Amino acid sequence: GGQQFSLAKSIGKNLIIYFYPKDDTPGCTTEGLDFKNNWDFFTDNNFTILGISRDSVQSHENFKQKMEFPFELLSDESESVCKMFDVIKPKNVYGKTVLGIERSTFFIDKEGILKKEWRGVKAANHVNDVISYLKEILET
């Protein structure tokens, strides 16, 4: 909580970075809980999970504690990381177009190379798709 994160310092780790729209909302809670419920798979296979949204550090701390997430949630209030991964997209909310985070997940390998991206995903069953892909690459 409250610490700076550096992608460069994560070389040597397999990263699963998922971007989600908002803390403590139904879809984002579902997605986070699916990552939590499959925590053993990720840790047993040396994957580090990071969730990112534009919510504040305090909001993340509250959400993480409430849901007992075993992984870190990173705050990107400035949208710099969101823009780097190109996940800020126009959305239609109650008839108005607003800019928001498109639910997306990225797999970055130990060398820091982007290996897979899932963009514009639905929260339900998304984590299963990620795990299926990772199981395939673990077998090769």
Short names for language-model regions:
Residues G1-T140:
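Chalcogenol-based redox active-site neighborhoods
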